[in-house]
Curated annotation (Swiss-Prot):
Protein known as: Staphopain A
InterPro entries cross-referenced by the UniProt entry: Cystatin_sf, Papain-like_cys_pep_sf, Pept_his_AS, Peptidase_C47, Staphopain_pro, Staphopain_pro_sf
Species of origin: Staphylococcus aureus
SUPFAM superfamilies documented for this protein: Cystatin/monellin, Cysteine proteinases
Residue ranges listed under propeptide: 26-214
Length: 388
């Protein structure tokens, strides 16, 4: 399943040392947290629409709690850091607003991504969609006292420090364009570090909120034995990773691996033909049948209730997505796995998804069939295969 390469995207980060007392509003009492070091992010335009800020403040804790419960984390307190944007080298935003979610130790645990609705979005209740995942949180936490730039190319996300050395901090399985140079450099005279406005990502914008009540009351349902055992590298095997993860979960085993699945279905392919081969829905169904399952193809996104019932009955669901940005090239189609579902304390229904590119899960509005993924692309959930 293939797609084209996205253009380089840059997120310019400046880290500075600062001491700030932080109020912790837990159990109706204020508790001073430890002094925090701030991560400052360059932005071209700090203006964030009021409804975007309100949406993030209103809903972030419920979304975060659903992932905490999926990960079996203990109850905790969180707050939002200042929002930032991600920019291309032409200094234009990618259109999204990013809010870091801070724990009481001053580290970023999650990133809230709020995006304007795209044309093929099936939901219509709001101008924006909200998703939560770990995304770049680990990278932001590792460079608290340095000026850095974050870039992305066909191999993933890089941190470039003041000495101009680059370190790959987040891999994405994008195949390098044969026409592009192997080493891509920052355009001369257009360094995004020249952007002047900043937002302190690890500076809390409000009091810490405990998820104690939300944690106790919120409904979360998960495939009991779902684990991330492997992630997709530089290949076209997203369907193999998806099926392996689902079968390992529903059979409660560790024996399935993406490469072995792909080799079973394409035994005669070698070299790059094998490395970048994908699977059709028919091949996915056939493999499941050979493993004692009776999968069914559904030519649409599964509903929240369908996900809830199938997950309760230990039946996995594979997502078949078509890239909104381009129907051509590497990963124009993409497979992902449904991990479970949750009903937030505001009544919002979400589906928990695993993208084989990622080391964590993400939330998805159950009425929204367009899924934003970690490289900035969007996939329309057009079909499902269930019964793994």
């Amino acid at each position: 399943m293939k797609r084209n390469f996205p253009k380089l995207i840059a997120l310019s980060l400046i880290f500075s040392l600062s001491i700030t007392p932080i109020a912790n509003a837990e159990s109706n009492s204020n508790i001073k947290a430890k002094d925090k070091r701030h991560v400052q992010v360059n932005v071209e335009d700090k203006s964030v629409p009021t409804d975007v800020r309100n949406l993030a403040q209103k809903d972030y804790l419920s979304y975060v709690t659903s992932l905490d419960k999926i990960y079996n984390k203990e109850k905790a307190s969180y707050t939002l850091g200042e929002p930032f944007k991600i920019y291309k080298f032409n200094k234009k935003s990618d259109g999204n607003y990013y809010f870091p979610v801070l724990n009481t130790e001053g580290n970023i645990d999650y990133i809230v991504t709020i995006s304007p609705k795209v044309t093929k979005d099936s939901s219509s209740s709001s101008k924006y969609t909200i998703n939560v995942s770990s995304f770049l949180s680990k990278a932001l936490n590792e460079y608290k006292d340095q000026q850095i730039t974050i870039l992305t190319n066909s191999k993933g996300y890089y941190v470039v420090t003041q000495n101009h050395k680059a370190k790959l901090v987040l891999k994405t399985p994008r195949l390098e364009d044969k026409k592009a140079k192997k080493t891509e450099s920052i355009p001369t005279g257009n360094n995004v570090t020249q952007l002047k406005q900043k937002a302190s990502v690890t500076m809390p914008t409000s009091q810490f909120k405990s998820n104690n009540y939300t944690y106790n009351e919120q409904y979360v349902n998960k495939l009991e034995n779902f684990k991330i055992r492997e992630t997709q590298g530089n290949n076209g095997w997203c369907a193999g990773y998806t099926m392996s993860a689902l079968l390992n979960a529903t059979y409660n085993t560790n024996k399935y691996h993406a490469e072995a699945v792909m080799r079973f279905l394409h035994p005669n392919l070698q070299g790059q033909q094998f490395q970048f081969t994908g699977l059709t829905p028919r091949e996915m169904i056939y493999f499941e049948q050979t493993q004692g399952r009776s999968p069914q193809l559904l030519n649409r996104m599964t509903t929240y209730n369908e996900v809830d019932n199938l997950t309760k009955n230990n039946k996995g669901i594979a997502i078949l997505g078509s890239r909104v940005e381009s129907r051509n090239g590497m990963h124009a189609g993409h497979a992902m796995a449904v991990v479970g579902n949750a009903k937030l304390n505001n009544g919002q229904e979400v589906i928990i998804i695993w993208n084989p590119w990622d080391n964590g899960f993400m939330t998805q509005d159950a009425k929204n069939n367009v899924i934003p993924v970690s490289n900035g692309d969007h996939y329309q959930w057009y079909s499902s295969i269930y019964g793994y």
